[in-house]
Amino acid sequence: MKTIFFILAITSSVIAQRPSAQKNRDVLFDFRKEPPASAVKIPAATQRTVLTKVFRRYLTNQDKCKSDFAGSSSDDYLAAARKAGMMVPSITDMITGSFTAAGQTQTAYLISVSECNASHADNFGTTRLAIFSGPQLVADVDTDFMSFIVRKIDLDGNGIDELLMNSSYMGQGNLTEMATLASFENGRRHVLNDFGSVVEDSCAAAMPGSNSKAAVIYTSAFAPGLKPTFTQENYVASCRNPRRWKLFSKGKMQEQ
């Protein structure tokens, strides 16, 4: 009996001394879940103030668009349209933070440029991010078609916020979403990680074998002064049971 108590005491002592498991990663975003739709409403006066500072000239009505303008036959049609003022821009989202330098109180406006006659192949136009410190425009960058703000985060703790953004493209019933994490330090866009495809959903195509694929992106646990590392797990679900996700790969998702 004494032997049993002795063994139990030793076991309890070992367990007590064993270090608890440490959390070594955090979820950056789970794309199996729909990102919340932006509830931000931009007043008309703010739209005018921001757009006037970002664009030298622009249109306020699609009916005023022209197909024949200077540079309309150039290889870069969208750039020519912007230069000619042939666009009907609008602010689609906004977020506050410290984006270009630490310790700032700034507002970032996401702008759908909507160049005149931009086609489906052009993703219906470019997207820009305009960052203001008070009334001053401090950054105006193209987002490379990233048209939604998914999350704001300061991953390395340097006081500068990064933005996780995504884009979506639908073709023949196949939905593809891409995502990037970018910093706007010093007023320039720096892509910290291009995650590639994070959603591939073919359910709307209603073809044999159609399914839904989505990524969960993790970042290493916060450590001051260290750059974060990322891991990606990819899940698949049938169109009939969209909530029953199964892990099928790790790393970047292979395009269908």
Annotate each PLM feature:
Residues 84-86, 115-123, 141, 169-174, ...:
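Short consensus segments that form the blades of beta-propeller domains
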Residues 8-17:
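Hydrophobic h-region of N-terminal signal peptides that target proteins for export
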Residues 79-87, 137-142, 202:
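A short beta-strand motif characteristic of beta-propeller blades
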Residues 146-153, 202-205:
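Repeated scaffold domains used in trafficking and secretory/extracellular systems
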Residues 95, 104-150:
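A glycine-rich, hydrophobic loop/mini-helix early in the fold
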